[in-house]
């Protein structure tokens, strides 16, 4: 019986006198059709190296292995260690937020691989940030199930109410697509919110490199720190206001431009000009 079976899951939990831990965002996927859709979206090929975060009982791990992937899984809850060890995967009982991704090489990881995961919702943003700041060149694709609200935020367009600094951050590194929505009924226990799968195809090259990346994201974080403010006011702690006005005018923007209306490409132009003016 597949690990996506609710009977299999509940039987396991009973056998270890365990339960889903809300503090770890443990809502286990128990729908085989959704697992197959995730696999198709991620485009996992035999021999691919795949990093999985929070495998839990291993429903996703199982289908990744069936596709011929080399899976390294990071799981915080030791309750699942013995069960996961029955699968042909490399399992680490660790906090994914603290795990040094460079150490994947010690496990035989070769070339560019993929991230495929049902991310714990309470650490979605820290993990997405870590994946790209720590080793952006390691990934071909990132396919994750996250809270639907967050999925809509990171796939929003300039001018949308959900458009945010996280949107700009992820688009710097990848093409980001909203793949499909997932009902709470597909989980055990049922979460109180809907979920969604997002697929990111990582760029071969990035617009900036080195310390400029940190400087650029300092600008975008400041811009969105007080999103109802004018851009020039939001950036006043980083750049003189008159300099920001000069750059905006040079690029054809109004002095009343707000941060949530500016695209990644436009932010890059603003950043480069602020460095040069």
Swiss-Prot record:
Q: InterPro entries, per this entry?
A: KsgA/Erm, rRNA_Ade_diMease-like_C, rRNA_Ade_Mease_Trfase_CS, rRNA_Ade_methylase_Trfase_N, rRNA_adenine_dimethylase, SAM-dependent_MTases_sf
Alphabetically, the GO molecular function entries are: 16S rRNA (adenine(1518)-N(6)/adenine(1519)-N(6))-dimethyltransferase activity; RNA binding
UniProt source species: Chlamydia muridarum (strain MoPn / Nigg)
Gene3D superfamilies from the xrefs? Ribosomal RNA adenine dimethylase-like, domain 2 (1.10.8.100), Vaccinia Virus protein VP39 (3.40.50.150)
Q: What is this protein called?
A: Ribosomal RNA small subunit methyltransferase A
Binding residues for S-adenosyl-L-methionine, per the UniProt record?
27, 29, 54, 75, 95, 118
Q: Could you confirm whether the keyword NAD appears in this record?
A: no
Question: Which keywords appear in this protein's UniProt record, sorted alphabetically?
Answer: Cytoplasm, Methyltransferase, RNA-binding, rRNA processing, S-adenosyl-L-methionine, Transferase
Task: Tell me what gene encodes this.
Answer: rsmA
Tell me which EC number(s) this protein carries: 2.1.1.182
Question: Got a GO cellular component term for this one?
Answer: cytosol
Task: Specify whether rRNA processing is a keyword of the entry.
Answer: yes
Functional summary from the UniProt entry: Specifically dimethylates two adjacent adenosines (A1518 and A1519) in the loop of a conserved hairpin near the 3'-end of 16S rRNA in the 30S particle. May play a critical role in biogenesis of 30S subunits.
- Superkingdom of origin organism: Bacteria
**Localization (cell):** Cytoplasm
Protein family per UniProt? Belongs to the class I-like SAM-binding methyltransferase superfamily. rRNA adenine N(6)-methyltransferase family. RsmA subfamily.
Looking up SUPFAM superfamilies in the UniProt record yields:
S-adenosyl-L-methionine-dependent methyltransferases
**What's the top EC group for this one?**
transferase
Q: Which reaction does it catalyse?
A: adenosine(1518)/adenosine(1519) in 16S rRNA + 4 S-adenosyl-L-methionine = N(6)-dimethyladenosine(1518)/N(6)-dimethyladenosine(1519) in 16S rRNA + 4 S-adenosyl-L-homocysteine + 4 H(+)
């Amino acid at each position: 019986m597949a690990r996506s079976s609710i009977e299999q899951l509940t039987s396991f939990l009973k056998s270890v006198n365990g339960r889903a831990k809300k503090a770890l965002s443990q809502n286990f996927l128990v729908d085989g059709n959704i697992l197959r859709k995730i696999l198709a979206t991620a485009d996992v090929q035999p021999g691919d190296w795949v990093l999985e975060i929070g495998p839990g009982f291993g429903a996703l791990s199982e289908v990744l292995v069936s596709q011929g992937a080399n899976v390294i899984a990071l799981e915080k809850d030791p309750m699942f260690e013995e069960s996961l060890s029955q699968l042909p995967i490399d399992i680490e009982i660790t906090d994914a937020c603290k795990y040094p991704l460079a150490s994947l090489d010690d496990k035989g990881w070769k070339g560019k691989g993929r991230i495929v995961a049902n991310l714990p919702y309470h650490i979605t943003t820290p993990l997405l940030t870590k994946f790209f700041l720590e080793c952006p060149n390691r990934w071909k694709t990132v396919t994750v199930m996250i809270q639907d609200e967050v999925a809509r935020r990171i796939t929003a367009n300039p001018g949308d109410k959900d458009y945010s600094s996280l949107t700009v951050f992820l688009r710097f590194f990848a093409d980001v697509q909203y793949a499909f929505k997932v009902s709470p009924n597909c989980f055990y226990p049922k979460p109180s919110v809907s979920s969604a799968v997002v697929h990111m195809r990582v760029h071969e090259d990035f617009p900036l490199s080195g310390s400029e990346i940190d400087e650029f994201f300092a600008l975008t974080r400041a811009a969105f720190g007080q999103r109802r403010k004018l851009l020039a006011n939001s950036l006043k702690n980083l750049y003189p206001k008159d300099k920001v006005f000069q750059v905006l005018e040079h690029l054809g923007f109004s002095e009343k431009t707000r941060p949530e209306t500016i695209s990644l490409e436009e932010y890059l132009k603003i950043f480069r000009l602020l460095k040069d003016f």
